[in-house]
Amino acid sequence: MSIIENIKSPKDLKKLSRDELKNLCGEIRQFIIESVSQTGGHLSSNLGVIELTVALHFVFDAPNDKLIWDVGHQTYAHKIITGRKNQMRTLRQKNGISGFPRRSESIYDEFGTGHSSTSISAALGMAESLKKNKSKSKAIAIVGDGALTAGMAFEGLNHAGSTENNILIILNDNDMSISNNVGALNNYLTKLLSGKLYEGFKKSGKKVFSKLPPVLELARKTEEHMKGMVIPGTLFEEFGFNYLGPIDGHDLDVLIDTLSNIKYLEGPQFLHIATKKGYGYKPAENNPNQYHGIGKFDPELGLDQKKNTHLTYTEIFSNWIVKAAKTHSKLCAITPAMSDGSGLTKFAKKYPSRFYDVGIAEQHALTFAAGLSLSGFKPVVAIYSTFFQRAYDQLIHDIALQNIPMLFAIDRAGVVGADGATHSGSFDISFLRCIPNIILMTPSNESECTQMLSFGYQYKGICAVRYPRGFAASLEKKQLKKLTLGKAITLREGKKICILGFGPIINECIKIAEKMNATLIDMRFVKPMDEEIIEQKSKNHDLIVTIEENSIMGGAGSAVNEVLAKKNITKKLLIIGMPDQFVEHGTQEEVQKACGLDALSIESKIVNALSK
């Protein structure tokens, strides 16, 4: 029987010999490749942390020792070791296990980390609690995939280094976030990793640690505390950490020996390890970006390169910005470490001097864009809905308050699917429409998206275009209607029922409108809202229905209700959107159905509203 079949908890790991542990790493790696090929998920990141994960669970005593993973998509080996191997076939599927750590899922998942750069702060809070409870256990933050590039990580470092808490920060340095890491910190780490001392350590590290005396011997502590034991990590030492490394993150012996020694050191410790994203699977090693987050695939053949006849909204944005840059020399693009996911790869290659990947730094991205705009450039900020909320104060204080012109291209708005609650784009309409000076548009098809991006770029103010993950409905040019600020378009005239649609969800309503002889309106703008058409349709319809892929709390439906109240119109109103709860993972279709946003559910809700 294979070793992996006997691993039900970290305790089983501790019974294994070093050779068995190495074999287990190979089995876990093969299992993850086969498992993700069936479910989809984050592959390259997880292949890079298998040896580290095995070493951590072998040396430390989770959950007494606290392991916080950052970013959380690198936890597949952790899930397998902590008894969830058989559930991996349900990964990111409806009613299955999450692709991220989840406290409700396992006692070994200490902290939910879907967004990056939160682990150091959380680990420090836990370390402080352990100290107050007089515990010798450690809080350990495993920071990888570029999470150290965010300001919050440095806020945590700044605080942690000034304490005497037993916190260990492990930098899993794979030179990647989702896209390539950028910035001065990455350059600094690259210099550390390229040093001759590191090359020598890779060869002799095992010997160094094998000569160390038994656990708790003073000599070992003295040697461990020598500054710059391998390479001087001046930056981290200045923060107040005892810096160790860099070491080879794929050498299990070195990892176990190093962690075993660190285990008994007190105070803030910083271990720098070097890993390769996609390690052990050549297609992922050669193209870690492409294998970062993937769908189902054949492990023998790699990813399917077949093209769909329809464009995704991301591809629509990608094509638009490359074309727009030809005629607008002041156009520049900004993304917080999402150049591939946001569709900026082609732009970056064609216009490298006008492309800015600022790292996982959403707050900085927005205020940086403000500075560019005030200097005569027109920034286009490409950002996921779920990450946009990380820079809310910058949006309000630095941009909207000063009415600084720029365009926000908001990807992954609404139902996202398999990534679940941490990545759902449920809130952007609600948190954007309450801010003065912002125009907010919701395209429902390919042509409308292109129109709105062009309109938003040329507008002398702040515009946001929100669009979902997935393919866009196409529209013939002869059907295209002119885009006018704050004006909706009527797609179909009917009686009794008037459906006001915001975004692609309106396509679910076309057949419903025909079946029920309802009026169907593409609202196009959430802000400014077309108050005239709302007032007009409320006079000759019995029921107004709003539909959106956003939380019903403060969303577009609430905006319509405000218009009715403002104009003192009493009318039956049905608001359909995402419920007031965090949305679970599943396919987009499954999540839409669970939220009542599929055609059958929409029709049923309308029928029920009419009967009341």
Predicted regions and their residues:
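Structural signature of the thiamine diphosphate
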Residues: 215-283, 405-410, 429-478, 599-612
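Non-catalytic terminal/interface segments that mediate subunit docking, oligomerization
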Residues: 66, 275-388, 394-404, 500-503
